Amino acid sequence: YSSWYSGSIEPEATFLSRFPDKRSTEELTEEDRRFIRDRYDENVAFADAQVGALLSILDSSKRYEDSLVILMSDHGEAFLEHGRYLHSRMLFREFLHVPLVIKWPRGVSGYEAEVAEPMSLVDLVPTLEDGLALPAQQEGYQGRSLIPLVFDGAHRQEPLWATTRRVDTYQKPPRPLEMLQAGPWKILYDPLSDSSRIYQIENDPGESQDLSGELPMRTLYLRQALLRQRTYNRELLQQAPEPGPIEDSDAEIQKQLEALGYLN
């Protein structure tokens, strides 16, 4: 994928040495940008090969048919669609749209379908409960089963919600950002500046046209829906058990996390 590249970017360099204090991409050439995309494609191809190897082991050991296999991702990756690289910095489609593939075990059939309707990763647990006929948990987490979508195409009633902390520079504290998607409408909300952007994602899947100035009442409605969802999330969080202690990681793990940009 990237063996053709002869530029200055060092793949093994740490995140902070490459982006010490900003997300500016002005110094990157078109060749650099193509190389970054190709390196990401290499990562995807490597992950695909590892998944294939795992499935081959399950198959050769006669365990594949009895296995529940779930393929998913925690986030997408940006390549300047909205002026940024990397991930977890904004809440546009390229950051949030990820795959979810479920291979059910032997004895669980009838769920084979491709669901195009947007869903949330919090829907995974209730989907597994329904699909495997497990006792449903009534408290402690959110989400809804996707099984009705398979059988009768029922549309999602609950909005999709996401949050992140935007890092503009490492000299400033992260800025919280929130997103709510209800049907074809999506709002991005910055609590610190109390500012909103809204998009009609059916007509504008690339989220390039902010309609908040043209549709102030729609913006207000979506903002109120987002704030209600935030309040509900916080109330639910109060019911969650206290997290256990985090054990100190060894030096090699800390080095890897720093290289990936998780520590500074």
Identify what each model region corresponds to.
Residues 1-264:
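Catalytic domains that recognize anionic headgroups
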